[in-house]
Structure formats: structure tokens, C-alpha cells
Amino acid sequence: MVTPVSISNYISLPDDFPVRNIAPQVKEVLKDFIDALSTIICNEEWRTSLNINSATKKIFNNLDNLSYIQRTSFRGNDTLYNEKVQFKLTYPARNGRHKENIEFQVVINLSPIYLDNFRHDGEINIFCAPNPKPVTMGRVFQTGVERVLFLFLNDFIEQFPMINPGVPIKRAHTPHIEPLPSDHHTAADYLRQFDLLVLNFISRGNFVILPRLWNNSEVHRWFVNKDPNLITAILDITDSELKEDLLQSLMDSLGSNKHVLPEVCICFLSLLAEQESPHFQNLFLFFANMLLHYHQFMNPNESDLNDVLMPASLSDDKIIKHMARRTLKLFVKNETPPKVTHEDLVKNRPRSPVRPPIPATAKTPDLPERH
């Protein structure tokens, strides 16, 4: 078993989320819920047994009564395997001096599954257990949690089986679905598919990427894979405004975690080694903007950097050529970069290069305030 590294740390509610007065604990509910799903997907032991040992149960934090139910039914010549996962979420709600626990019963019906095309006609049930003394905060909290979980569960049921078309996902106690080949049947594969689900959820505008703290292993996980990875998944988004917002959030987030920038540099140099990549231009411009503003922290390897910059400086693309030569000039001449203060970064943060203009000066244009 591969211990899942929760992606929920990289998800936060935007200001314009379509539910008013959401309690701050909603994010914690979603975090625990996503952690639970990632464990369900990755833990072979759990998916093949109804018994949850104490070590596994600790991963679920405050999840209680987690269970898996599977029934068989028949429709004509088809055999239907009705699967259901259910569990409870218990969270405190405060109203002045009063504190009460609110219990959510979450039921995920993955049914029925047809033999011919692995189609899900599943439904989602999320409800709050009867509470004789609901507090005002509790009702607001309930509304927020139900909305958040419904959005995510809807994506989970409808899109998870389709993330890797043609490769059925092995399900516990479901004999008619062929298991994944041995080289594609590891916890890491399930975790990768779950990552893609979350990225898809993010790309629909329900959430924005805004990690508060990165570490090297997380950077490696999100960027080391050439396809797909976090930034290429964002670049595949067709909504230009959303794409630019996500890239800007990502750049701001990485820039505020300078301790991981050397690892970010290594990962991007590896990605840019293949110039035939369909995302090469945007990847290069994103990296070049990061490098020009944070190179005193990124500490690039000179040889690897030249392997990327020299061919790029001969590119037919004027923007790539300009950025490559500008970056080469900075490093070849060993120019000492001006010290950038925190106030400077706030005023002139690097711009995410979705459709960047040819930069004329070293100063990054001011971005309008986002609302």
C-alpha cells in the first residue's frame, strides 16, 4: 500500500463560492472527505475487506462508521452490481457560548454498473441527521457542507470512471470487471487517477489552487510527471479567464514558498527538455517568468539551464526567443540581480503567461486586484 498524500491541502474555497455565509469548517470537512476517498482508492486492503483495522481507521481522522455494501440484481440478461459506500462526518458548530455536534450521513451509491459499457447511473445522498436543537450556525454549516460535497461527489461518480477511457477501474467484490494489468494496478495508479479527478473538479471553477505551504516531495509529485502534471492540466483548460487565474494562483503560491523553488527549477528543466511538447511555449514562459523574478532562490544548474535556453534562443517564436536571450544574458554575464523586497513582489508580482506580451523592460506590469 502507498500512503496517499492528500491533495486536499491544495484546495480552498474562493470568495465567490455559490453558497453564502459558509462556515470556515467546511474546508475541513472537504479535506477529511477527500482524504477518505483517496484512502479508499489507494488502500487495496480496505477495498477488499469490510474490516477496518485501527491503523487504517486513523487515516480517516474523524470519519466514523465507514462501510461498503455490495448487492447483486438482475435486469433482463444483465447482472447489476449495486455498490454503496457510506460514512458519517461529525463536526462541532458554535453559536455564542453554545457548542453542538452536527452529524452528516454521506451515502455514495455507485449503481447500477452495466456490463457492456461500464456506465454509472449513480446517485448521491447527503443529509444531516435530525437535530432537535439546530443552531443558526449549524444550519449555515449544513448548507455549505451539503453544497460542497454534492459538487465534489457529482464529479467523483460521473467522471472518475472516464478519466482513463477504455481501462476499467477494478472495484472490490465486482467480479465482472477485469482487473487492471499488473503494471497498472498499484496504489499510485489509483492515486494518479484521483489527482486527475480533483484537477478536473478544480478546472470547472468550483475551487482554486492556493496551497499555503509546499514541500519538496509535493513539488516532485505535482510536477515531475511529464504528462499529465499539475501545470499541463491547467493549460488544457479551455476557459481562458479561469486558466489565467489558476496559473497566477500557482505562480503566487510557488513564489511564496521560496524553500521549494530549487526543486521547482529542477522539475521544470526536466519538463522543458522535450521541446516537442504541445505545451512547451506556455511551460517555457511560465518558467522564464519565475526564473527572472526568483532566480536568486531557484539556483538553477548552469548546464541544464543552457540545454533549455540555447535551443529556445533560436526559436522561431519571437516571444520564446526574446525571453530565452534575456535569461541567457542574465546568467552568462553573471549579472547580480537587484534585491527584490517583499513590497516589490506585492506591487510587481510575476504575471502568469497565458497570452503574454513581449516584455520590454525588467519590470513586470501591475496586475489588477482580483475580486
From Swiss-Prot:
Top-level taxon of origin: Bacteria
Residue numbers spanned by region Disordered: 339-371
Name assigned to this protein: Uncharacterized protein YneK
Taxonomy of the source species: Bacteria, Pseudomonadati, Pseudomonadota, Gammaproteobacteria, Enterobacterales
UniProt gene name: yneK
